[in-house]
């Protein structure tokens, strides 16, 4: 399925490949924003709200490009990170949950790894002969 819908019909309720790609790009963007010590913008909040909503205009190519751009931005931010700031406090969300700079960077990496794995399994299962 092209759109970033939360469930692909034949997948038994599992998240679709499109959802994983959209979520991957969004989580990277949000975690890196918090890691910089910044609040989310209205645009980021709107994108978060739209993540699980089917959108036929989101093609697989556009979703993959958005994720690739997110990875490029993450790598650039990591390269520019001053190691002296890694234990600095950062705050997440409207509730301002305390976290460390390094904690957010690690969480972004772990969450991305998890969803890439889920994406690969989803695509393999969807492509399997029936």
PLM region spans:
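Short, solvent-exposed coil/turn linker segments
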Residues: 1-2, 82
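Short, contiguous alpha-helical
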Residues: 3-51, 91-130
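Acidic/histidine-rich alpha-helical segments that form the ligand environment
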Residues: 52-91, 103-108
């Amino acid at each position: 399925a092209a759109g970033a819908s939360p469930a692909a019909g034949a997948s038994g309720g599992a998240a679709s490949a499109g959802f994983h790609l959209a979520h991957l790009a969004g989580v990277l963007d949000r975690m890196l924003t918090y890691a910089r010590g910044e609040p989310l913008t209205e645009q980021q909040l709107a994108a978060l709200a739209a993540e699980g909503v089917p959108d036929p205009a989101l093609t697989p190519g556009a979703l993959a490009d958005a994720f690739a751009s997110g990875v490029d931005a993450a790598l650039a931010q990591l390269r520019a990170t001053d190691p002296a700031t890694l234990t600095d406090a950062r705050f997440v969300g409207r509730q301002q949950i305390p976290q460390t700079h390094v904690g957010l960077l690690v969480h972004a990496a772990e969450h991305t790894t998890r969803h890439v794995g889920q994406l690969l399994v989803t695509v393999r299962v969807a492509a399997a002969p029936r």
